[in-house]
UniProtKB/Swiss-Prot annotation:
Principal location class: membrane
InterPro entries noted in UniProt: LacY/RafB_perm_fam (IPR000576), LacY/RafB_perm_fam_CS (IPR018457), MFS_dom (IPR020846), MFS_trans_sf (IPR036259)
Keyword Transmembrane helix attributed: yes
Physiological role: Responsible for transport of melibiose into the cell, with the concomitant import of a proton (symport system). Can also transport lactose, and has weak activity with maltose. Cannot transport the analog methyl-1-thio-beta,D-galactopyranoside (TMG).
UniProt effect for mutating L88P: Does not affect melibiose transport. Increases affinity for maltose and maltose transport
Protein name: Melibiose permease
GO function terms (MF aspect): lactose binding; lactose:proton symporter activity
Effect on the protein of changing A182P: Does not affect melibiose transport. Increases affinity for maltose and maltose transport
Length: 425
């Protein structure tokens, strides 16, 4: 008996939460791509102060991420957390225009702290909570999470081009567009009726779904060289790249005759990149299964180094747009490669913990310091000289990671050797 024939086409939860992804990432795209431009051109912050704002966002993210993770697990399929995030997103425009902006102009630290708390909660930490919730719904409602997640790429891409046009007319329109989209988010939550899977309910009652994880096993992770080498890659490559990308929009628009023209071009380039991102995201598992997770991470590192170093030598708008498009290759290879690496090298029962601590937490923690450092360097020596330093560092860590990251074959060989040693005793 086939129970999954009409899994997606006739599954209301697939379409409801696919649209939820679309709208949520649409709203997120009213913030992040244009935030550095808004901070510099509208608020008048220098690059050092912009770096402080991004550092506060990272600090808030690492504070909220584990808390929201625990709350999300306890709530299960209850929509309480999604309602809180959606209501806060409805206040997106009022907060930015009437709280965040005045505070930034009055006191950079108060403004950065308030913006960091808000953006860190609804976006940096909230996105993980939403993704975890919808992934749970997908398992209970029998649809593929990855296919629903692709709606998010389309939402981000659509908003990037629309927002780029509106930003040139009146930046406040972009924020009000985000608040309006939040109303549709709340409407989706009203009609969404995720139901627990009956089999899962029985298994939970029997205790069969309880993870066999202890605090000792978690702490033992940090005694493993493999864990620290993975964290080295995450901080030295992925984190540095994120810091580079934070203020890239400000650098990008300097290649155009007017800031408005540059903002519009950045929006269109982001849209094209997100469409390519969605296509490559769909194909990336097929590629990664053939080349292996370690090689995928190394390729991602080379792509990131190429974009950063290339940006330091860019002299025309065409060159900087082409370099921007490399982001569409990097994102799928890094995200899918990281998950494949974690599940292939470490105990799969600890995969969520490793991803939270070794990837998200490590990256956000390092970004607190690197964002402020990069912002200061932009002011002191300029974008391109700083990019050359960052790019060479990323390239160096990628080369080192070729020798320090583990492959599945190396893990299997080590396990086999350990088994033979045990038998010989």
């Amino acid at each position: 008996m086939n129970t999954t024939t009409c899994t997606h086409k006739d599954n209301p939860n697939f379409w409801i939460f696919g649209l939820f992804f679309f709208l949520y990432f649409f709203i997120m795209a009213t913030c992040f791509p244009f935030l550095p431009i808004w901070l510099s051109d509208i608020i008048g912050l220098n690059k050092t102060h912009t770096g402080i704002v991004f550092s506060c966002i990272s600090l808030s993210a690492i504070a909220f991420q584990p808390v929201l993770g625990v709350i999300s697990d306890k709530l299960g399929l209850k929509k309480h957390l999604l309602w809180i995030i959606s209501v806060l997103l409805f206040l997106f425009a009022p907060f930015f225009l009437y709280v965040f902006a005045p505070l930034l102009k009055t006191n950079i630290w108060l403004g950065a702290l308030s913006g960091g708390l808000y953006i860190g909660f609804v976006f940096s930490a909230g996105s993980g909570a939403i993704e975890a919730y919808i992934e749970r719904v997908s398992r209970n409602s029998a649809f593929e999470y990855g296919k629903a997640r692709m709606f998010g790429c389309l939402g981000w891409g659509l908003c990037a081009s629309t927002g780029g046009i509106l930003f040139g007319i009146d930046p406040s329109y972009v924020f009000w567009m985000g608040s309006a989209a939040a109303l549709l988010l709340m409407l989706l939550l009203v009609v969404a009726k995720p139901k627990p899977n009956q089999t899962a309910q029985v298994m939970n009652a029997l205790g069969a779904n309880q993870p066999q994880i202890t605090a000792k096993k978690v702490f033992n992770l940090f005694r493993q060289r493999r864990m620290w080498m993975f964290i080295l890659y995450v901080i030295g490559v992925a984190c540095v790249y994120d810091v580079f990308d934070q203020q890239f929009a400000t650098f990008f628009k300097t290649f155009f005759a007017t800031p408005q023209e540059g903002t519009r071009a950045f929006g269109f380039a982001t849209t094209a990149g997100e469409i390519c991102n969605a296509i490559i995201m769909f194909c990336s598992p097929w590629i990664i299964n053939r080349i292996g997770a370690k090689n995928t991470l190394l390729i991602a590192g080379l792509i990131m180094a190429t974009r950063i170093i290339g940006s330091s030598f860019a002299t025309t708008a065409v060159e900087v747009i082409a370099l921007k498009m490399l982001h569409a290759l990097e994102v799928p290879f890094l995200l899918v490669g990281a998950f494949k690496y974690i599940t292939g090298v470490f105990d799969t029962r600890l995969s969520a913990t490793i991803y939270l601590i070794g990837f998200q937490f490590a990256k956000q923690s390092a970004a607190i310091f690197l964002s402020a450092f990069a912002g200061n360097m932009y002011d002191r020596i300029g974008f391109q000289e700083t990019y050359l330093m960052l790019g060479c560092f990323v390239l160096a860590i990628t080369v080192v990671s070729a020798f320090t990251l583990s492959s599945r074959q190396e893990i299997a060989a080590a396990a086999g050797a350990a088994a033979l040693t045990s038998q010989s005793r």
